[in-house]
């Protein structure tokens, strides 16, 4: 059984309220509120996106720029605050992001309820 589009959109809209802060990790962040393997940002902390609701069961976030050290980043984390044990969700990055020197990682979050 599938959800009608209006119901999918309502669920996506609720989800965006859980957290707007995003970060990156060098491995799986795990299933606790403290993201494991999170980057030690070179300037600042996790960065907030600005969510926009669509009409097809999705929400789209504005791009966030994270100042990160050299490393291989395999996962993104969604949190409810810029710091602390506030992780609510995570996802594998595709493709993996490799920084050979300190630089910026750009994430553009999206969520779809299917």
Language model features: what each stretch is:
Residues 1-75, 80-114:
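Small cysteine-rich, disulfide-bonded extracellular modules of the LU/uPAR three-finger superfamily
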